[in-house]
UniProtKB/Swiss-Prot annotation:
Protein name in the entry: Aspartate 1-decarboxylase
SUPFAM superfamilies: ADC-like
Family annotation (Pfam families): Asp_decarbox (PF02261)
Assembly, per entry: Heterooctamer of four alpha and four beta subunits.
Species this protein is from: Caulobacter vibrioides (strain NA1000 / CB15N) (Caulobacter crescentus)
Length: 118
């Protein structure tokens, strides 16, 4: 049996931009992608702490060091600049492996700087 487990989480990221006219996706600073293990084009769920909205999209790379968290396309209607969000990805693995598995969790401050990563 395969279980769906949390793979990675960016916790309390601050939305820096929302672009309705862009094709889609969420742009994430390359430093944050690297710290979390989220890959460009990987499916992510975005949980808006500020308004409760939840949506699925895919990650794209924003410039390294930019601190960008930019929601694009139709999902831009579900966020506003300065909203706090959680970005999560999942993976599947056998139940035996899942018992000892630990996801990567990256805690961010209000400027999208890494406070803690584990």
């Amino acid at each position: 049996m395969l279980l769906t487990m949390l793979k990675a989480k960016l916790h309390r990221a601050t939305v820096t931009q929302a672009d309705l006219d862009y094709e889609g996706s969420i742009a994430i600073d390359r430093d944050l992608l690297d710290a979390s293990g989220i890959l460009p084009n990987e499916q992510v769920d975005v949980l808006n702490i500020t308004n409760g909205a939840r949506f699925t999209t895919y990650a794209i790379e924003a410039p390294r060091g930019s601190k960008v968290i930019g929601v694009n396309g139709a999902a831009a209607r579900l966020v506003q600049k300065n909203d706090l969000v959680i970005v999560v990805t999942y993976c599947q693995m056998p139940a035996e492996e899942a018992r000892n598995y630990a996801p990567t969790v990256v805690l961010l401050d209000e400027g999208n700087l890494i406070k803690k990563a584990a």
